């Protein structure tokens, strides 16, 4: 049975446990704390404190997410969409994508090798046979 999050100490402890596993965005962390029974009146001040102390960082979360998803073969369009769905500001997402050290052309080649065994289609009509490839944002036709 999980503990009730009815005190600032309990909320902070749970938030730090979640952050110890991986970086979280503020919106995501708020959602997880709410799911565990914490109220917004107690969540917000604790998240503000964690951010002031440098323990909760949107910039680190963006960097970590971009690195992870690009490493899984996703392109900037898909990553941008996923981060937007997670409640992050469009300007922050764009800045993080610009500042990321991801070589998108190299990632695209890696994904191409993995999905098509390095074979180049003879024409553009061959690409729709793998629509999932273009949806990842890694397609050379986009």
Curated annotation (Swiss-Prot):
What are the boundaries of the region Disordered?
Answer: 118-142
Q: What keywords would UniProt list here?
A: Cytoplasm
* Disulfide bridges in this chain: none
What's the chief localization of this chain?
cytoplasm
Quote the subcellular location field of this record: Cytoplasm
Q: Name one GO biological process term.
A: regulation of DNA repair
| Keyword Cytoplasm carried by entry | yes
Which superkingdom is the protein from?
Bacteria
- A single GO cellular-component term on record: cytoplasm
Concerning Pfam families, the annotation shows: RecX_HTH1, RecX_HTH2
Q: What does this protein do?
A: Modulates RecA activity.
Q: What protein family does this chain belong to? A: Belongs to the RecX family.
Concerning PANTHER family, the annotation shows: REGULATORY PROTEIN RECX FAMILY PROTEIN (PTHR33602:SF1)
The name this protein goes by in its record: Regulatory protein RecX
Q: Which organism is it from?
A: Pseudomonas putida
């Amino acid at each position: 049975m999980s503990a009730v999050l009815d005190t600032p100490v309990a909320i902070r402890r749970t938030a730090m446990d979640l952050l110890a596993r991986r970086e979280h965005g503020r919106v995501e962390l708020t959602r997880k704390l709410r799911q565990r029974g914490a109220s917004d009146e107690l969540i917000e001040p604790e998240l503000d404190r964690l951010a002031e102390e440098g323990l909760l960082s949107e910039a680190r979360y963006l960097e970590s997410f971009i690195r992870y998803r690009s490493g899984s073969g996703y392109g900037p369009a898909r990553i941008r969409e996923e981060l937007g769905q997670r409640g992050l500001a469009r300007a922050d997402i764009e800045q993080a994508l610009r500042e990321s050290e991801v070589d998108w052309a190299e990632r695209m080649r890696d994904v191409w090798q993995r999905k098509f065994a390095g074979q180049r289609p003879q024409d553009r009509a061959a690409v729709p046979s793998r629509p999932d490839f273009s949806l990842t944002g890694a397609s050379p036709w986009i």
